[in-house]
Amino acid sequence: MQTVHEMLRRAVSRVPHRWAIVDAARSTFDICRTGETSRNEGSATARLWPQPARPLAVVSGNSVEAVIAVLALHRLQAVPALMNPRLKPAEISELVARGEMARAVVANDAGVMEAIRTRVPSVCVLALDDLVSGSRVPEVAGKSLPPPPCEPEQAGFVFYTSGTTGLPKGAVIPQRAAESRVLFMATQAGLRHGSHNVVLGLMPLYHTIGFFAVLVAAMAFDGTYVVVEEFDAGNVLKLIERERVTAMFATPTHLDALTTAVEQAGARLESLEHVTFAGATMPDTVLERVNRFIPGEKVNIYGTTEAMNSLYMRAVRIAGTVMRPGFFSEVRIVRVGGDVDDGCPTVKRASWRWRRRMRPFQATLTNLRLLQKSFRKAGTGRAICVRDGSGNIVVLGRVDDMIISGGENIHPSEVERILAAAPGVAEVVVIGVKDERWGQSVVACVVLQPGASASAERLDAFCRASALADFKRPRRYVFLDELPKSAMNKVLRRQLMQHVSATSSAAVVPAPAVKQRTYAPSGRAIAR
């Protein structure tokens, strides 16, 4: 077992002068200097954070300073609780209060700092720049800090979910889980150990992927981490070419924008060897463009938060929902009452020995440990899947996203995949809204391409001409300028449902010409 500190300490001994971090301004830290900086900063900060093994809020986006701060706090035996700076100040302060944190480091946002001080006056709040000042970290005389404890079950880091269904929930990552969260980039994504690795830091550090699978993997594999503070497709394209990036982890939204930039610039990106994506369903049209304009092996990852990586598929050339179980996990396809045969759509449960531990709002770390066994027994069954005889698993969607209309199960991804190919459609999300007669009604929320035009009637005709079953056609269309999304580019479906339920501007299309079955409580079919 290796902690994050141990993995980076060994990398220092192997390649002491390798550039570990590079940012857009071409500021560089070699791996040895990064280790020394975090060690010195940890010593300098010890007076402010004398409580090892306690969670401590870190509110920051991607930056060299954020990397140094998190590594220093980890070196200091604190438990960095990384938070999304795009959350509202009131939400961040509430997370600090409910997490019972006594310290917070904030990336120079006066509003957030004031909100924390107001909500929890006892919290010591420090600006990130006051903790870390680039290369001007003060040298500290005296004895060096002892190595961080290596108790397997001790909390190492806290990450928060994307908050698609409300205030984000904390996930505590124990020390023993760090190594596997890095190594899966080798076992599933094909990343090889060596100083040839130049990894693009596109994913946010406050997400488990952005921290473990991108930052720590790049440095622990003796490579270089290229910081991306703000995503702009044109600037990222230039950064990839300038730094000769060999690997990147991105969301479908990132890749969609990047393929457009590559096409417009006529770039080739010949240095890219590995492209891994997750965070949302990959539309077929975007996947085709990714394979056309972006080189390197493509890997689709599913389940990075709940079970580190429960499913994946390498050499992706077709619809991105056909996947296989990952090296560190086993998958059962179940329903209430037991397992099911291959070919039947039902719920996936992933088992992973070092699965995350859920952190309830009011729970302390002690209470958290008491919940660990029950969480392991519960599994992480949230995906509707079909497994074929070869062991391939097709992810149809999430259990809580499934629409039940007139007794029929409708998976949003089935409808979204059809509509995504319609002329003029840039993005589409299908949701179910309450319907007095049918329980739920299918609604398509559509973002059009710049300059494009479309109507509910045209999109409905497109669905009628497709292979989509008639009862699955959307009954309403809502045209939006943009979709509400989290920092991981996941659509915030609850916000979308609230918006659609409150609006009367949705275009309504005719009911289907064919009959749809619905079911009475007795189980007898009723013609629709």
Curated annotation (Swiss-Prot):
SUPFAM superfamilies: Acetyl-CoA synthetase-like. Changing residue 166 to I: Significantly inhibits the adenylation part of the reaction. Optimum temperature is 35 degrees Celsius. Pathway: Xenobiotic degradation; 4-chlorobenzoate degradation; 4-hydroxybenzoate from 4-chlorobenzoate: step 2/3. Coiled coil: none annotated. GO terms for molecular function: 4-chlorobenzoate-CoA ligase activity; ATP binding; medium-chain fatty acid-CoA ligase activity. PANTHER family: ACYL-COA SYNTHETASE, ACYL-COA SYNTHETASE FAMILY MEMBER 3. Catalyzes the formation of chlorobenzoyl-CoA via a 2 step reaction. First 4-chlorobenzoyl is adenylated by ATP, followed by acyl transfer from the 4-chlorobenzoyl-AMP intermediate to CoA. Benzoate, 4-bromobenzoate, 4-iodobenzoate and 4-methylbenzoate also act as substrates. Inactive towards 4-aminobenzoate, 4-hydroxybenzoate, 2-aminobenzoate, 2,3-dihydroxybenzoate, 4-coumarate and the aliphatic carboxylic acids palmate, caproate, laurate and butyrate. Negligible activity is detected when ATP is replaced by UTP, CTP or GTP as cosubstrate. This is 4-chlorobenzoate--CoA ligase.
